[in-house]
Swiss-Prot record:
One GO biological process term: choline metabolic process
Self-association state and partner proteins as the record states: Interacts with PRIMA1. The interaction with PRIMA1 is required to anchor it to the basal lamina of cells and organize into tetramers. Isoform H generates GPI-anchored dimers; disulfide linked. Isoform T generates multiple structures, ranging from monomers and dimers to collagen-tailed and hydrophobic-tailed forms, in which catalytic tetramers are associated with anchoring proteins that attach them to the basal lamina or to cell membranes.
Gene: ACHE
Catalytic machinery residues: S231, E362, H475
Swiss-Prot/TrEMBL catalytic activity: acetylcholine + H2O = choline + acetate + H(+)
Cell location: Synapse; Secreted; Cell membrane
Pfam families, per database record: AChE_tetra, COesterase
Cysteine pairings via disulfide bonds: C97-C124, C285-C300, C437-C557
InterPro entries hit by this protein: AB_hydrolase_fold (IPR029058), AChE-related_enzymes (IPR050654), AChE_tetra (IPR014788), CarbesteraseB (IPR002018), Carboxylesterase_B_AS (IPR019826), Carboxylesterase_B_CS (IPR019819), Cholinesterase (IPR000997)
Glycosylation (residues): N293, N378, N492
Name recorded for this polypeptide: Acetylcholinesterase
Enzyme class: hydrolase
Species name: Felis catus (Cat)
Length: 611
């Protein structure tokens, strides 16, 4: 019997009607939606409409911005993507750049959330655009995200970087890009054309150029681009600030938990070459052994499977360490004309607007990756001996005297053996040395040289966090709030966290709009003051109202940024004096031995008889 609600049903009409319904309800309807069809310089794109809690957004995912850097293009600067025929499907993320995958805690959410969620490939130079639906009638500010991951990992497709929430809630255009990491992005044989180094940074720059050329098509304003990133992404943002060819491609900058002057962020040309040639040797290049030139070495490296390079890249580090990474940007005299410290000190930053900040416990995340006595599966109550050994891996370049100074500064001398205090001290050593104090130093220098700077410390531990309580608020765990993930009900954040995320998104969007995180429409709320070299004001970000403080870990950063460099300089002088003294003593000893031998020889000769 025919259902009463289907009077026209016949077998001959069933299939066409079903296809028509699928077309109207599925991809066909979106294919005809003018909001989801755009034309960029490379050709046409078809995007997808996604739902956020507040409404829909348009997403254009997996847009190629460079030719695939495969085969003979491995290690070379990127080439702009050539035009394509027809309409390119941009409804799903593309491959993740080849990289190391973290297997320390298999299946654990705290590590898996940072692992690649798409297929690994060297064909990976794609970007993504989220824009309000419908597109803004007038040009809207653009936020461009650079992911972190120690320059050895990361992907723009990770769930934590989902741009739909920020684009919908704040009406901004959000862009993210993949860039090459590890040896593929940062292996360098300085002076060679085959592997010049810093090609991962050049990938980012090419994506920024793509934004300038195309973002207006999506409703974005190419004259109001804010570059933001976290950890190695923040260091990358800083390097673009310091590299003149990049400076004209964006207008404001946000550096979250990273800075270009961090001790892990760059290497010199000599160390870069040492690491490159060591990796080559580890994978059997050049085939004839030592003595080959750069061209032969790179030609050989290009024949090696990508996974071979990944499997060996950690073996090139000069010593056991935490918060050090194998292939990072090189001070090449080109992208970086000098060290970041020198460029920061010499730069003119008048008119620049910068937002910088850190989280409460920057060091804790890294301790489970090599500091003695630390694990996510226990309380990590370490002994004094483990703390002393931890300082050597936490500050791997330190001389004996410098390491003693670190121990002296971070020991609670009323409780020098207390395991909980030692655990906290070890976290502070790694966090202050690598993140907090480089960020504070950068903020002070930029402010002193004309930039308008805002600074924060993020202090809220998410209710959903899977890492143990002793780790506090770890590195990277402000990102989910900046991107608005607590707005998604299925993720089970609290109501207070949803409000907090909305507040943070508003701060970041306000900064992208005006260069000031404060909301001019609501002057009654606590104001976020600029950071100056004198007052050093910053704010704490947590569930409570904004709190203004002064001096971001000022005592610790005076140690790292002022005292320790002077100590190292003095000990370098002492070491050189000792070397010269030993050399002189050796020459004097040799002379005395020679003199004694001559004297003994003379003494054994027959003496003249008395006349």
């Amino acid at each position: 019997m025919r259902p009463p609600w289907c009077p026209l049903y016949t077998p001959s009409l069933a299939a066409p009607i079903l296809l028509l319904l699928l077309f109207l309800l599925g991809g066909g309807a979106e294919a005809e939606d003018p909001e989801l069809l755009v034309t960029v310089r490379g050709g046409q794109l078809r995007g997808v409409r996604l739902m956020a809690p507040g409404g829909p957004v348009s997403a254009f995912l997996g847009i190629p911005f460079a030719e695939p850097p495969v085969g003979p293009r491995r290690f070379l600067p990127p080439e702009p993507k050539r035009p394509w025929p027809g309409v390119l499907d941009a409804t799903a993320f593309q491959s993740v750049c080849y990289q190391y995958v973290d297997t320390l805690y298999p299946g654990f959410e705290g590590t898996e959330m940072w692992n690649p969620n798409r297929e690994l490939s060297e064909d990976c130079l794609y970007l993504n655009v989220w824009t309000p639906y419908p597109r803004p009638a007038s040009p809207t500010p653009v936020l461009v995200w650079i992911y972190g991951g120690g320059f050895y990992s990361g992907a723009s497709s990770l769930d934590v970087y989902d741009g739909r929430f920020l684009a919908q809630a704040e009406g901004t255009v959000l862009v993210s890009m993949n860039y090459r990491v590890g040896a593929f992005g940062f292996l360098a044989l300085p002076g060679s054309r085959e592997a010049p180094g810093n090609v991962g940074l050049l990938d980012q720059r090419l994506a920024l150029q793509w934004v300038q050329d195309n973002v207006a098509t999506f409703g974005g304003d190419p004259m109001s681009v804010t570059l933001f990133g976290e950890s190695a992404g923040a260091a990358s943002v800083g390097m673009h600030l310091l590299s003149p060819p990049s400076r004209g491609l964006f207008h404001r900058a946000v550096l979250q938990s990273g800075a270009p002057n961090g001790p892990w962020a760059t290497v010199g040309v000599g160390e870069a070459r040492r690491r490159a040639t060591l990796l080559a040797r580890l994978v059997g290049c050049p085939p004839g052994g030592a003595g080959g030139n750069d061209t032969e070495l790179v030609a050989c490296l290009r024949t090696r499977p990508a996974q071979d390079l990944v499997d060996h890249e950690w073996h090139v580090l000069p010593q056991e360490s935490v918060f050090r990474f194998s292939f990072v940007p090189v001070v090449d005299g080109d992208f970086l004309s000098d060290t970041p410290e020198a460029l920061i000190n010499a730069g003119d930053f008048h008119g620049l607007q910068v937002l910088v900040g850190v989280v409460k416990d920057e060091g804790s995340y890294f301790l489970v990756y090599g500091a003695p006595g630390f694990s996510k599966d226990n309380e990590s109550l370490i002994s004094r001996a483990q703390f002393l050994a931890g300082v050597r891996v936490g500050v791997p370049q330190a001389s004996d005297l410098a390491a003693e100074a670190v121990v002296l500064h971070y020991t609670d001398w009323l409780n020098p053996e207390d395991p909980a205090r030692l655990r906290e001290a070890m976290s502070d050593v790694v966090g202050d040395h690598n993140v907090v104090c480089p960020v504070a130093q950068l903020a002070g220098r930029l402010a002193a040289q004309g930039a308008r700077v805002y600074a924060y410390i993020f202090e809220h531990r998410a209710s959903t966090l899977s890492w143990p309580l002793w780790m506090g608020v770890p590195h990277g765990y402000e990102i989910e709030f900046i991107f608005g993930l607590p707005l998604e009900p299925s993720l089970n954040y609290t109501a207070e966290e949803r409000i907090f995320a909305q507040r943070l998104m508003r701060y970041w969007a306000n900064f992208a709009r005006t260069g000031d995180p404060n909301d001019p429409r609501d002057p009654k709320v606590p104001q976020w003051p600029p950071y100056t070299a004198g007052a050093q004001q910053y704010v704490s970000l947590d569930l409570r109202p904004l709190e203004v403080r002064r001096g971001l870990r000022a005592q610790a950063c005076a140690f790292w940024n002022r005292f320790l460099p002077k100590l190292l300089s003095a000990t370098d002088t002492l070491d050189e004096a000792e070397r010269q003294w030993k050399a002189e003593f050796h020459r004097w000893s040799s002379y005395m031995v020679h003199w004694k031998n001559q004297f003994d020889h003379y003494s054994k000769q027959d003496r003249c008889s008395d006349l």
